[in-house]
Amino acid sequence: MNKIFKVGLVGCGHISETYFKSHEYFNNFQIIKCADINMEVANKCAEVNNIEACSVDELIKDKEIEIILNLTIPKAHYEIAKKSLENGKHIYSEKPMAVNFEDGKHLLQLSTEKGLYIGNAPDTFLGGGIQKSIELVSSGTIGDIKLGNAIFAFPGVQSYHPNPEPWFAEKEGGPVIDMGP
């Protein structure tokens, strides 16, 4: 029988609904508690999903929790991940892992030191298309790359998110920080 990991979810906003709906298709983890900086939101999430709500600090320090699922806004990802690792928790976070390279590097070093796993969504960056691209570039089939261009035709977070304002706050990066990584 597979081990069932006990997961604590931080950030009970819009994206958490997707995780709650899809987690029932997996038999190796169970979201047992949730937290949010807004306790009203955490309590509502807990009630809807029949789990326990608590503060962010309580969740991160909870001995029963093995993995923290970090669904907060990008500028909070680093602090939540850092505290989680410091408290012996594996961490899986929405993108990006951190809003700057140094913080991301620090999280990877910390996870290695602690012997913990750290992962990020979307995991499609390691999918077939990207792996094939890496293969073609590495083998020299494509040749030296001199320029890259990307087009992402999507109306942005404001088209679907019930509360897009935090994404556009100072230093948040807007759609680029959401879709770019």
Stretch-by-stretch model annotation:
Residues 106-124, 143-148:
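Rossmann-fold dehydrogenase core element
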Residues 1-48:
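N-terminal Rossmann-like dinucleotide-binding module
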Residues 33, 66-67, 147:
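Short, Asp-centered acidic motifs that coordinate Mg2+ and/or phosphate
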Residues 11, 95, 140:
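Conserved G/P- and acidic residue-centered "switch" motifs that form tight phosphate/ATP-binding loops
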Residues 19, 51-110:
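Beta-loop-alpha module in the N-terminal Rossmann-like domain of NAD(P)-dependent dehydrogenases
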Residues 124-181:
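Predominantly a Rossmann-like dinucleotide-binding segment in NAD(P)-dependent oxidoreductases
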Residues 26, 48, 62-63, 127:
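Acidic-histidine catalytic/liganding microenvironments
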